[in-house]
Amino acid sequence: MKPYVASPACFLTMRSIEQIKVDVAYSKTDVKLIGISAGVSYGALGMSHHSLQDIAVLNAIPNMTIIVPADPYETKKMMNKLADFHGPVYIRVGRNPVSEVYHDDNFDYEIGKAKIMHDGDDLSIVAYGEMVRVALDAAIQLELQGIQARVINMHTIKPFDQE
């Protein structure tokens, strides 16, 4: 059995950090943690409900894989890959619906491997999660000004794809 735990990211990562560190990450337990409503998704509920440091805190813990999918298609691919992936994983998702980055699920997905979403030689924009759509829109606007921007979807924050 492979446990999946879902909870608001602000509580999942900060209130249970000692248990995540010792009982999940250090022992390389095959647990998948899903932080929902990450970032400032809970807006008006105030700073106690914002999860701005979840990625930074979990990035400092050994053996933890951190994934932030860009859209529903990538989330589906990621979940399918996690079925065969052993080890602790933190998945960060927002609260609100996100714009599609992919138009279907006909693409390759590999945990730990970034994906070039738009090619360009003038500059590179690296994004993850719902910001990938924003980066793609920015690349289109830059193209209108004669600037060719590469957009890289860094869906896996840790381990970081150094290629």
Question: Where do the protein language model's features map onto the residues?
Answer:
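Short beta->alpha junction loops
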Residues: I152-K158
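Conserved thiamine diphosphate
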Residues: K2-S124, R133, A149
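Short helix-loop-beta junction
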Residues: V134-I152
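A short, acidic, amphipathic alpha-helical segment used as a generic capping/interface helix at domain edges
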Residues: P159-E163
